[in-house]
Amino acid sequence: MVSLKTEIAGFSFDNCLMNAAGIYCMTKEELLAIENSEAGSFVTKTGTLEAREGNPQPRYADTDWGSINSMGLPNKGIDYYLDFVTELQDQDNSKNHVLSLVGLSPEETHIILKKVENSSYNGLIELNLSCPNVPGKPQIAYDFEMTDLILSEIFSYYQKPLGIKLPPYFDIVHFDQAATIFNKYPLAFINCVNSIGNGLVIDDETVVIKPKNGFGGIGGDFIKPTALANVHAFYKRLNPSIKIIGTGGVKNGRDAFEHILCGASMVQIGTALQKEGPEIFQRVSRELKEIMADKGYQSLEDFRGQLNYL
């Protein structure tokens, strides 16, 4: 019997597939639709200290090869999502969940995390160190000194399981430098990758999204090679206790298989979920199981990280 079960930081999931933060997770209704789908879990919209409207519309556009967006972290505020996942965790047959969050400053991040620390929520946290679409706010994880400082401060008081969502890295030296920092801390996971920041898509003679004069994060098919490279590079460098969530370019079972082959313990779906809805989890699960059965694999552990080299 082929199984898609997986585990992160002691939390078990019946299916390794879930949504990516930012997609189909703004409201309780959207999150419940994923909860009731074949997905193994959901991650909430990235919650900030206060609710945000985000960037002006239009701020998302589909393309033939994926998508471009400059959402600007629209969300209903951390209290909305924290209350919801806390309420859900006490229900019978509830799945384990991931609460995504970030402050618009290091001070705000600490305020939010201390709120979570003092709450009764006992699930996973995904700290977003990689949003490329908030004007005037750099992606923290590209500043290694700042990343080290923030993680040091967080783990001086935060005791619950926490992982981080990362931007894509493109230099081998950066993989080495980042992994050295991450291995210093009791991270539950890293998520590779957020969208590739500051792409530009043009229709005829005009940009397709309004914020930042058309500059936005690139997702979908286009970023899969970059996502796979990040997953595998960190799989080879991180302590085994730090699991990896693979995100980027997943629209079918083969894409999910490749992320796991590169070392991912869970796989998130973003652009394709936006286009297809929660029904995508049933299809991709079926396709992934068929691939595994054809290859004689019964579990994800049979092939996770077992990428062959020439």
Swiss-Prot record:
Residue sites binding FMN per the record: K45, T46, N128, K165, V193, G220, G248, G249, G270, T271
Principal place of residence: cytoplasm
Binding site for substrate: K45, N69, S70, M71, G72, L73, N128, N194, S195
Reactions catalysed according to its record: (S)-dihydroorotate + fumarate = orotate + succinate
GO biological process: 'de novo' pyrimidine nucleobase biosynthetic process; 'de novo' UMP biosynthetic process
A Pfam entry, by short name: DHO_dh
Keywords: Cytoplasm, Flavoprotein, FMN, Oxidoreductase, Pyrimidine biosynthesis
Described function: Catalyzes the conversion of dihydroorotate to orotate with fumarate as the electron acceptor.
Name of the molecule in the record: Putative dihydroorotate dehydrogenase A (fumarate)
Organism annotation: Streptococcus agalactiae serotype V (strain ATCC BAA-611 / 2603 V/R)
